[in-house]
């Protein structure tokens, strides 16, 4: 649960420096509208703060697929990976194709390694390594099948959406007969952002609406990205007061 990760945040902030052997996936479910929680914090902020790759599923199938991808990425990069859901996605139902069930790995022998002791001498090297790893993940995010455009990409109006908002906007575009005039960038690997793929989507747009649960993390990054690359377009969202940072999105 999102507030539970607050309790684990002290060791998590060190663990991203140390790295892991094998795989470690942190599954965190946020609670927009506080249906059973004391706050509605956005735990994607931990991904940005500590340096965690972060997946954001929008459907039951993506919950499974992204979890598998997260374990694989964790093993490949030697670092913990986050899967961030929200109440609406966590409570969803759907037909899920499981794919191959892998055999269990055999027993492993524990090896004491002082490189995993979080002392300053190690931390100095580990921080540099973490920064390099996160930079190397940008092209991975660019190539991720979870980051893709639904509908035409060369429209003047676009939407960037993640989590449950993906489902709402795709339904709205279809029901309003806008499938040929609105392109939707479906953001599944939310951190680090797929910078090149997003820039390609932004180019040629007059207006882009950003839909994300809770804080405008993606929206702010898109504005910085557009300014850095000399793109002149209007980016609408929570930072422009067109949407609220309060509560969850609904189909209405």
Placement of each model-derived feature along the sequence:
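Thiamine diphosphate
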Residues: 1-75
């Amino acid at each position: 649960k999102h507030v539970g990760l607050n309790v684990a945040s002290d060791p998590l902030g060190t663990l991203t420096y140390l790295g892991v052997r094998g795989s470690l996936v942190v599954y965190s479910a946020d609670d927009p509208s506080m249906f059973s929680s004391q706050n509605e914090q956005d735990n994607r902020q931990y991904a940005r703060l500590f340096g965690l790759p972060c997946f954001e599923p929008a459907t039951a199938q993506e919950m499974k697929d992204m979890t598998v991808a997260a374990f694989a990425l964790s093993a490949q990069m030697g670092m913990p990976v986050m899967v961030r859901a929200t109440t609406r996605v966590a409570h969803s139902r759907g037909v899920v194709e499981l794919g191959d069930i892998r055999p269990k790995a055999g027993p492993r022998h524990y090896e004491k390694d002082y490189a995993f002791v979080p002392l300053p001498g190690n931390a100095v090297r580990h921080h540099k390594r973490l920064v390099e790893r996160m930079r190397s993940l940008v092209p991975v995010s660019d190539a991720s099948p979870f980051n893709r455009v639904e509908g035409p990409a060369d429209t003047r109006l676009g939407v960037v959406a993640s989590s449950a908002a993906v489902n709402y906007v795709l339904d709205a575009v279809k029901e309003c007969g806008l499938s040929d005039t609105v392109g939707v960038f479906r953001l599944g690997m939310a951190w680090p952002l797929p910078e090149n793929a997003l820039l390609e989507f932004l180019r040629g747009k007059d207006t882009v609406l950003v839909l994300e649960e809770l804080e405008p993390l993606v929206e702010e990054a898109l504005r910085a990205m557009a300014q850095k690359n000399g793109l002149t377009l209007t980016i609408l969202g929570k930072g422009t007061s067109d949407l609220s940072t309060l509560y969850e999105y609904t189909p209405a």
